[in-house]
């Protein structure tokens, strides 16, 4: 539902389907806004602490849940995989035989130390 609402709002405003990058930028700015709200500040150190609090910021983006790892601020999300195919329903290729690999299955260990 979140994704459908995002696509509809984007198409209404810009007259075209959103790209993958459009959704990522939208989600990234919303994650930043959540951290600023949580910090009650725009000061960098306060926002950093908000990103890292409680095991890392979590945001339910249009494409799914994203989690920021507190140690290195890497954002993890489910990995979408599939075969591309063209249909008359869309002016671009879509994914067929879609598979979503959980973020925990693709996360790599951080080398960052605090």
Enumerate the language-model features and the residues they cover.
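Extracytosolic ligand-binding ectodomains
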Residues: 1-114
